[in-house]
Structure formats: structure tokens, C-alpha cells
Amino acid sequence: MAFTSMVSTVPVLFFFFTLLLISANSSSLSHNIKVQEQDKDPFVGFNIGTDVSNLLSPTELVKFLQAQKVNHVRLYDADPELLKALAKTKVRVIISVPNNQLLAIGSSNSTAASWIGRNVVAYYPETLITAISVGDEVLTTVPSSAPLLLPAIESLYNALVASNLHTQIKVSTPHAASIMLDTFPPSQAYFNQTWHSIMVPLLQFLSKTGSPLMMNLYPYYVYMQNKGVVPLDNCLFEPLTPSKEMVDPNTLLHYTNVLDAMVDAAYVSMKNLNVSDVAVLVTESGWPSKGDSKEPYATIDNADTYNSNLIKHVFDRTGTPLHPEMTSSVYIYELFNEDLRAPPVSEASWGLFYGNSTPVYLLHVSGSGTFLANDTTNQTYCIAMDGVDAKTLQAALDWACGPGRSNCSEIQPGESCYQPNNVKGHASFAFNSYYQKEGRASGSCDFKGVAMITTTDPSHGSCIFPGSKKVGNRTQTVVNSTEVAAGEATSRSLSRGFCVTIMILVTFSIL
């Protein structure tokens, strides 16, 4: 999962060049990389974790996936109710063997066969299971289980062969980026030799079976561990001038974003072990929308920017500098905020949606087809969250109607939105007034964590909320303002504070 991807760092060289160098002809580096037949086109999917206090029921969750045009998901287990609910849909599913089941499966062929029978044969093909991820970051999080990894993978594969499902369903295991060393420049990358005894036969297995190398890649952690060296814009897929592009001095290939460099590092690492025909599948990548005081770059703005640009990057099909002919598919971590996860705060804040399906923020993915309907939701509103104490809500309400310059005239005594006369109702109106005034901008519905976005019109009776379709030709009075909440302004200024690139040769650490 996300937190385990920041386990270790190693020193490497990072170059910033002011002049545009002539890129090497990357076509000579291309290889016959194998991709599953049904997934020849790159896609974006989502990880679905279940450490959520108010998660939708399986049936509701599937309806939500269909409404959002999400066609690829990765589960961290093989939940039977969810697999049943996914039957006869177009949603393609990666199911998982949790780390704590590796011992049983890796040491017993019959246990592996039983697992395939219960979790695959019982549902396929009505449920479109495309792959099995065996464990999660086993080499770096539970190294004591490493010797069981390949036996478990092979036992599961043999069980698929026995059921004649081995060509439709692939078997692999997700790795943390920290299994690679010297990842920039990518041309120098290699797998940690500690794991060669496992990686060599694993890669040979992936090559033989046409399965992908699964990698969990997080530019967020690269930035957090290398602040001041790796510019934020490079991590967020933001447009760069040539002087800010990362250049591999060995190949002269230009890298406009960190994720591409990490993917190419994986390809080079495989090539160094004489494997050149295995595709990289990014099984986790994302950016948290909230963090504690030590995580100032975990903001809604940065999460929106990263994930929106990531989606566009995948659907642009431009590949990587090393493999322009090959675009890796990506599973965003994650669909829902897992509010039950242990600290730090960011661990509970990777989701695009809250567990009840209301969006944490709205992605901006225009031009990416029908993917993610939340991008095309024209009518969204900002309301007070349930369960927030009245004192905290009152403070946020006071800011919205004061420094925030929301139009709060409708919640005054005798006006149309005064009833119900309670702080939650008044706060919702004031929050939404501010949100609409700010053009529903990313980050304008937070109020220190007590507000949330909803697609349900909160208008009631004669009380019409700003932005409502019920407004018709009614003119809403708003006050233009460039002010934002103090906390939001601080995080925004900080998040751009490390974007100045000094054109020197430096040594730094990267995942």
C-alpha cells in the first residue's frame, strides 16, 4: 500500500540542463513487450481498499463504478460479495492474495488449487477477473515471506492451467519502487541484488506467461524525500520548460515527469537481468489530499493536479521516453478515502471519494472520453459534514460569512434559508455560497476538514442554494473575492515553494 513505498532511498545523480539536447532515437530501444490481448489499449483503473467506516454495499459500489465509467479495479482480497456483484458487468478485476495467506498457498499445491476454485472458478467468466496479485510489496514489507512468493505464484498458475484459465488470467506480484537502486538516470537502474535469487526466476516466469511486472510507483514520496532537489512540477506532470526537464546523460532522453522515469527505471532493471519482453503495470500511484504538519504537500490542489494529469498522460498514449510505443496502464491509489487507516493523516486521504461516494475533489480530465463521470458533473455543492461538533462548525461558518465573504443574507432571521435554524444548516448554505463564488475551484470546499462536496442539490422548500438548477433566472448576489482560508493559502504557497530549479549537478536520494 501507499505508506510502505517510502521504505528506503539511495543516492543517485540528477541532472538539470538549460539547453535542449538532441534526444536519442528511442526506437532502437524498443522490444516486443507482451500485453494481455483484452488490454492492448492503456487504461486507468482504481484500487479499492475497505478500511472505510461507511463503505457502500457491494451492490451500491458496483452501481457507483458503472455510473463513474470505471472499468478496471484492483481489490486487496477476493471479497465474495463484491465479486458476485461485479458479475455480468464490464468491470475488469484484479483480485489479490493477502500477504498473510502466502505461507499456506506457497507451501501447498492443494491449498492453491482450492483458492483458485473458491475465488476464480466460482465467478469467472461472469465476473471478468483479469489477474491475481500475489501479496503486496512482499520483498520490502515482509521479507521473511520472500522465499514463499514464487512458489505461491507458480502454484496458483498451475491451478489456473488445470482449469484452462491461464491464458485469460495472469499472475504477478506488486513491488515497491525501493526494490530498484540508482533509479535516476533510468539508464543506470538495477534491482537490489539482495533479491536477485527471487527476481530472476520471477521475471522469467512473467516472460514465459505473458504477465506484467507490477510496480507501486509514487512520485509523491520521491518529492517528500527529495524536497528542494526534485521540482514539484516534475512530480505533478505540470508543463515544463526545456531547462526544467530531467535528462538522462547516458541516453540523452528527456523526462518531463517523475513517473515516466520510474517506469523506465523498471524496464532498464529488467533488461539488466536479461528480460526485455515484460510490460510494466503500475498497480498503485496517487497523491494524498490531506496530511499533517509534516506533510504540507498533501493537499487537494496537488492531488487533483497529479491524478488529473496522470489520467490525461495515460490516455494520450505517448509512452515513456525509453518506450514511446508502450504506455503503461495505471491503477490510481485509491477510489475511497480509508478513514480507518492508522496515522499519518495522509494514509487516510488518498481517495477521490469518501466512503459514501461523495467526491473529495473533482478531477479535471476533459478529453479523456467518458472516463470518470465526476469530471462532467456540472452541478456540485459544498455542504457541512455529518458528525462535526457545533463549535467547530460555527467557527467555519463565521469565517465563511466574514473573511470568506460568502453571501449569507439568506440565512438571516426571516429569510428563505433561515430554517432549519441550526448551525449545520446555516454552515452548509454559507459553505456552498463560498464554493460557488470561487467557481467550484479545487480546495474551495474544505473549511479545515468540516465540509464535503456533494452532487445532491441541498435546496429545500423555498430555500434555493447557489448553483442549484432550481434557481432558473433568479439572480444570485455574490461578492467577488480572491481571499482563501488561511490554512489553504499557506499550503498552496508552500506547495509551489520548491519549484525553482537551480541548474547544477547535484546528488540526491530517490525511491
From Swiss-Prot:
PROSITE patterns attached to this UniProt entry: GLYCOSYL_HYDROL_F17
S-S bonds: 382-445
SMART domains in the cross-refs: X8
Bilayer topology: Lipid-anchor; GPI-anchor
Main location per the UniProt record: membrane
EC nos: 3.2.1.39
PTM per Swiss-Prot/TrEMBL: Contains two additional disulfide bonds.
Protein name: Glucan endo-1,3-beta-glucosidase 1
